[in-house]
Amino acid sequence: MAETPFLGPFCGHFSKFGGMTKFSEFPYVADRFNAVRRNTVQVHVGDALIGGNAPILVQSMTTTKPKDVEKTVAETLALAKVGCGLVRITAPTFADAQGLEEVMKQVRAAGCKVPVSADIHFQPKAAFEALKWVEKVRINPGNFVDTGILTLENQTDKSFEEGKEKVAEAFTPFVQEAKRLGRAIRIGVNHGSLAARMIYRYGDTVEGMVESAMEYLAVCEAEHFDQVVLSLKSSNPRVAIAAYRMLAARIKQEGFKPYPFHVGVTEAGAGADGRLKSAAGIGALLLDGLADTIRVSLTEDPVAEVPVAQELIKACALPVAPSAYNVPVFEKDPYHYERRATQAVKIAGVEIGGNSPVKVGVKADAIALTGERRNAEFALPSLNEKPIVEFKDAMDIAGFAQNPSAVPAGSVFCYTGAEMVSGVRALAAALDAAGRQDPILLYAKIADNETETLRVSADIGSLVTDGLGDAVVIDGYKGAKESVLLAFDILQAAYCRRSKTNFISCPSCGRTLYDIQQVMGKIKARFGHLSDISIGIMGCIVNGPGEMADADFGYVGGGPGRITLFEGKTAVKKNIPEEDAIEELVNLIKERGRWQEP
């Protein structure tokens, strides 16, 4: 159960960020203790509004291609029926983009006014065609002009600048056409499909994602076109959170208009794990006030995504009234992961903080009730029993900030008041200002319902991404065993600790080359006992190899009925018949000495 490291520091050909070690020098929000929703341009997508003072819009995506008109129309209407505010349809070819004409005719003939967005990769010609028929078109800066996604050959500083000119040359006419037709554009960067020139310049980093978006956004600014939505997606919530934060700061730094954000975590998976991973990433950004429209990407029927997204928005509503913590600015860099340095302190004989991974505990009274500890690494006594120091509200934190010596060194601090994220950040700021390295315990008492489960995942996901938290205790969720497992699952969802097999799986779309929901179930059943590995399950190659960069092994659609197996980012077995692919994956894992019998 080792901690999972971040994907490394930004690499160093060039940086506009100047180190970015202090939040106050490069802020993404005005106040990290009292977030308010970011004030943005309002984008019109048909009858829908994104950003400004509009409610956060929920969207989803069909699993069909536009050429299959009947199924595409049926899925669009089904999504609209459950409250989806915008439906996205992939158009992988020019012919598919042409098919959008008939899809839109039938959707509107059915009395459905939900706006539609086309999703385009590799095909600028298809993007131009899609503008004729739908209200919004998403393009991917990783492959709109640059299509050499996985090659870094012949990349130089000169070729990088020449590439920027090519982007302007190719993208400007598209922006002009969108402006003429009254359409909206999403500049949708994916961590898994950065252009080769961006990888050359910045590495496989958050900075590369941000600069990819900024390059295309500069074209929109030059054309005085502001009907733009931005997204920076990754399958790693920690990467996604840092990327959106940095983009908000960069837009402000550059003096661009504040464009709205489409927030999501790609390849979240299915079931409870998919929901927790989505909450850890999307929820953290909702709590930062950075989301204007969201999509929860589950490897399930698209209509299942909508109620989860709606519940997540409800769970992560921002407080109406600010809290007065009266502590110094929380300067910790929000763009580069580094766990807060702490001294080791023991709770019930178990070391918390220091070099130990984030520990999972259980309330001692809960163990007494059930007689079962179930994987908990320590038993938490009363919250007011040494070495625990409980702060219940902003006044407690402010009092400590004024007189930190009143609390003995070697304590474990715990905030149990409202708004866990802002409270723990304020606590950390007070500790840092006092030169204290006492550990912090993240404690949450929740009820057994989806809203509170999503919220606690968002809270903990946000805090561990900030490098805060040395132990986690969830109290009140079903029972002691379930509370402990939920805590471990949230830490895994937030890429903090791995306690079971990690599955990275994309939602199905029109590019998917096999029944991914069925295959996902089979792979989970076959490999779910391998707690020390990560497996990517991807429908196609558009984002697959890149988005599963964290995975040890990958199962990727390589063609109709054919699968390519990956080890890391390297394709090691190609053109495998789908019916043989799972056993071939077993053999590959055995060959690498990582197989264990269930």
PLM segments and residue spans:
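N-terminal amphipathic alpha-helix/helix-capping segment at the start of soluble metabolic enzymes
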Residues: 21-60, 175, 179, 318-365, ...
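Hydrophobic faces of well-ordered beta-strands that scaffold small-molecule active sites
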Residues: 56-62, 87-89, 116-120, 137-139, ...
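Glycine-rich, proline-tolerant flexible connector loops at the mouths of alpha/beta enzymes
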Residues: 63, 81-107, 141-162, 228-237, ...
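Short, acidic/polar
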Residues: 67-78, 122-127, 278-282, 369, ...
